[in-house]
Every structure is written in C-alpha cells, then in structure tokens.
Amino acid sequence: MKIRNLISCALCGLTLFACSPSGGGKDREMDCFITDLMDRMTLREKLGQLNLPSGGDLVTGSVMNGELSDMIRKQEIGGFFNVKGIQKINALQHLAVEESRLKIPLLVGADVIHGYETIFPIPLALSCSWDTLAVERMARISAIEASADGINWTFSPMVDICRDARWGRIAEGNGEDPYLGSLMAKAYVRGYQGNNMQGNDEILACVKHFALYGASESGRDYNVVDMSCLRMYNEYLAPYKAAVDAGVGSVMSSFNIVDGIPATANKWLLTDLLRNEWGFGGLLVTDYNSIAEMSSHGVAPLKEASIRALQAGTDMDMVSCGFLNTLEESLKEAKVTEEQINMACRRVLEAKYKLGLFSNPYKYCDALRAKEKLYTPEHRSAARAIAAETFVLLKNDNNLLPLEQKGRIALIGPMADARNNMCGMWSMTCTPSRHGTLLEGIRSAAGDKAEILYAKGCNIYYDAETEKAATGIRPLERGDNRELLDEALRVASRSDIIVAALGECAEMSGESASRTSLEIPDAQQDLLKALVKTGKPVVLLLFTGRPLVLNWEDANVHSILNVWFGGSETGDAVADVLFGKITPSGKLTTTFPRSVGQLPLFYNHLNTGRPDPDSRMFNRYASNYLDESNEPLYPFGYGLSYTDFVYGELQISSETLPKNGELTVSVTVTNKGNYDGYETVQLYLHDIYAEIARPVKELKGFERVFLKSGESRDVKFVITEDDLKFYNSELHYVYEPGEFDVMVGPNSRDVQTKSFQAK
C-alpha cells in the first residue's frame, strides 16, 4: 500500500471522528492515520518499531545487504543511531519505505550534543555564558547541520544536575543549579525542534538522562543513585520538567537506579511522574543497552527486564533487542498485554508522524543541503563568538591580560597544538582535520606584530599507559619527558611572557571518564612549576571538561583563563580573548573545590545545626574539616573581567511582599574600567524559616548586561510568590509566608543582602 493511500484515510471526516475521541484536528488526523496503520501491522512489525539498534558498523557496502538490512525490510527496526552520511542514511530510508511491506520510515538518531560538523563549546562551558539565546542559537545550528546530513533525532539536551566534579559527564550538563539548568534546557529544546519540527532543518530533541544520573555515588559513572523524593523535587527534577514544558518530543531514561529500581523499569518515575504528573505524551527511549543491564543490577534477566521496562512506560529499546526478541512470548504468557505493546508502538509512530516522515520519508535526505549547510562560514563565525562568551577568567593579577601584540610570546604545553582535542568528547560527528589549533589561532591573531614561539613542553602524563587510557581515540604523539621540558625552558628563556596551554585532554571528561584526582596531570604540573620558576609572567590557559583543583596554580600563576573545550573555533576564539578583542564574561555554573575531599560541593546547600559561617579549619564542634576550609576555591557564579564592574547599594522597593503582589529589587552597576564588556548580575533568595530546611541561597534570577567603559545601568528584578515556592514534606509546591533574605552580586559569594517579609 502506498503512503499516499494511508494518508487518504486522514482526510475522511467521519473516520477522523471515529479514530480520535478528543483533541484538535491535527491530533485527530495523526490518531486516525496511526490507527489505520497499526490495524495493518503484525505483532512482529509492532515490536520492530520498538527496536533501536546501533548502525555504527554499517559501511557503504553493507547498507543494502546483511542482517540489519534484512531486518529493515521486515520492519523489525524502528530506527538507527550512529549512522553518519547522507548517502548511507538515504539508502536505509529507501530500504524502509521501498522494500518493506508497510513502508514505515526510520528514525535516525545521533549524539548531537554541542554541534555536528561545526562544533561549539561543551555544554558545561555553554552554560557558563549564562546566555540562553546563544545556547538556542547553538542548538539551531546543530539541528540545521545534522538534518542536512540525514539525522532527524538528537539525544540531547543532557540536563542532569551534577555537584561532584569527579563525574566525567558533568561536561555534558549545565552545572549544579536547577534554575539556570531549567532555562538552558528550554533553550536547547527550542533550538533543536524549532517550529514544532515542521521544517526539514528541525529535529526531534531528547532530554536525558531521566533521572538523577548526575548524582551517581562517588562521582563514578553508571553508579547507584539514592536520594529522598524531597531532594529530587527541590534540587534535581526541575530541568527535566522544564524540557517537558518546552515541548520536548522524547525522553531518555537513565542507567542508574532510582529508589532501588533501574530507571528504565521504574513505573513511578516514567509513568506516574513523567507522564501522569507532568503530562509528557512523547516517545520514551532507553539508554544504550540498559534493559539488558538490569541483569547486572541484580533485578531481572532480559526477558523479565523487558516486561518490566514496557510496563513502566518505556517505548523504545536501545540496543538490547529485548522487546523484539522476548515480548511476543511474554504476550502469549499473559505477562504483558497487547494494549501495552500497542501504546509503545503508537508513540514511536507518533514521533515519526510529527517529524513529517510519513508525508516525506526523505525529508532529511537532501544531498544538496548536505553540501551547502555543513561547516559554513556563518556557522563557524557563530561558534567562534559563542566560544569566547564561555571562557571564564579565574585570576588576573596586575591586569596581565589582555596581552599586547608585541615582543615574544612563548606558547607552551601539550594542548597548544592538539588539533584533535579542541572540541571535547562528544564531537565524533565532525572532521577535526579542518579545525584550527590554538597555536594557529594565536599566530594568526598576532600576525607580524608579535613573535609566537612554541614548545610542547611535556606529555599529558608521565606514564605512557595512563596517557593511553586518558586520551582514548584522540592520542597525542609522545616524546621524551626530559627532552620536552628542556626544549620548553629554552623557548621560555627567549620569551617576554609565557602562555601555558595545559589541563585535561578531550577524552578525560565525558562518559566513562570519572577521576579520583582533579589536579592537572603530573607531567603538566611539573612543567608549569618549571615555567613559573623562570620568573617570566605566566598565563595559564586551562583546558578541562570539569572543575579542577587549582590551589597551587591560583597561588603561583599570574593569570588563569579557563577555556574548557571550546569547539572547532577554539584557536581563534582564545586569541580574540587573549589579545583583548573580546572581554571575557563567563561565570562558573559549577563550584571549583579546594580538595576532592570536599565533594560533592555546591553553593545552594542546606545549613546544619552547627554551621561554620567563617569556614575555619578545625573549628571544634562545628561542621567543618580538620585540614581544609569549607569554602570553594572559586564559587558558583564567579568570573572576572578585563574591566571593573562596581555595584551600587542594593535597593528594595518595600520590606513587605504582599500576597499576590510583587517586590522590586534593584542595583546600579557601573563599568569603571577601560574595556567594554558584559556583566552577569545575579539574584539569590534565602527562606530563613520554613517547614523544611531550605538552602542557604538559591539563584532566582540574573541579567546579562553590556556596559561600555564609564557606563552605568540600573538592573532590576521583580520578586513574586512564585520565586518563593518549594516542595514541602508532602511534595506540594507551596510558598510559606515569613522572612526572606534577598541577595544580589557578581557571584554567589560576594553579595549584598536585604530582608523582606512575605505575607
């Protein structure tokens, strides 16, 4: 039966009415179309729609032949992921719609996390811009490029709150704060899905990992998560809900257990909360092989795990093949119902319908777009500008930065000329050979005004095996450690200033990249100490996908600029900031600890009955450490500038917030420095007394303002009852009248405070 014949049923008004008891016209059309299609499907074909294998092993010659191709022809596959290239994807869709019985098109997914061919900064870095429009722009460009190359589904955004820098996947999220994380989640969804996925450059977003994956015990990936519902609701769930509220089309369940049950089989999480309480009606997919992994959790072998996942509300099985291979027998045994299978199948088909694949299966297979829309000058320009927004200036003694374009500048370090390591871990879809290096970017910016000297200086680690494990698929050429250091010192001796490009390489953060030590790796530490001993001014350019412990560096290096992994335009973007073309404006969205022993560490913590407000070490009978302050090295919201922003006195319109009313908080910010720049003014609240203990402060607003040198701006925030609400002990979302502190400042530590009474 031709697709156009199937569509014709949706044009019949009587049939429309019969197929859909409720909803608008578009929903009735979709319901009728899918009902008609499912009436024609066998059980095996329905189970096939629930099957999502990896196509990573497909090469050009194997697209049309082989086991997976035969499964497509038999409609035993609902979609693929990890297939790159318009020709291959076009061939796969051809198999599905031209050589199968019912001609059902495929979903084609990919981890388009922070770019496709044009790579933007890692998500943690993007969040440090505090610029939701920039994040939306990044997602829009990513969708344009991915869709031009055949992708119609991205496994992004990742919105897991993380407060433990040992966890490698902190690099993929938006930091530790649920308010900021929620705004970023919405921006990603808007960027990917655009106008409800009507255009051929708009793709299906997938919020992940639902839920709580960022709270893995010990910061170890895939590890257990165990927390109260109160903490879930107040501190971790908000960004997922924000994505749902923004209309995200799909959700990915997480690897971890929630309340003792793997998320993939957790009915309370996936049905009671996500679908019933939040109203999510889209596609729910597992993470990679997570149904099969329930066996290792000690919960169920594959057959029973598949039953439990389906009953919990899971629609699509990534890689495990449990649904396809076991549910038919489970149905015969009456352990699942046909209604449950039908509902999962319907949701997969609805996702395809909303993408427009039934109307045009080749909507995302335009070879001309693939030639015209990938890695364009416009996209590269956006990536360069956005990268510069994400860099965080952590230290700048004596205004060493920006550098003057004169004299001799020594660029030293293993990250200075590491082309494959500029983009971060989730950049497998790009072509690194055409990206510039840091060395190339700085030399291009310096031109003939300054001489740029270069030395690698050291390996990533002293030990070759440790480095091999750390660098993964992006190895760096190793040299003799002693010879590299000697060369670096010779180069440094000829220079006027030293720029050290050090830190993590790309594979040291991201999935399966947990660390117990958060210092800069050993060989690089020794290089930096040797460079400081020369007596020359030293700038540290820090490459990292997580907060690092930088106590020695903060005490001994003149300037520290955290550039994260800035994407395909890293070299030029760093040069723009290094030489003062752009003033750094990034602010941390995750706390930098003084010690791994402080972790998990976050600004919006609860107080204890014996707090230590002065954060003194060994303050007996107070909540502290014998050997370390409670305070972080760099707090949430922190970030310096080349210019000097001065805050006037905090003003509050009233000392009372009336019921159903509002209260205005304002502060005048003046740029008293010599550079134009952005400042992110931050608003925090503290509920002094409540039914349950409340955080010492919570971000409730911010404004990113651009001020020219000498310019002042009145920054205003309006506080309402909604800003005071929280989930109480019965999980009701309420606000309680009482006394509150309102705080405003450039970061979570350096704030002015006023109090008001909420009626």
Predicted regions and their residues:
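Bacterial N-terminal signal peptides
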Residues: 8-15
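Positively charged n-region of N-terminal signal peptides that target proteins for export
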Residues: 1-5
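Glycoside hydrolase catalytic-domain context in secreted enzymes
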Residues: 16-728, 734-748, 754-755, 759
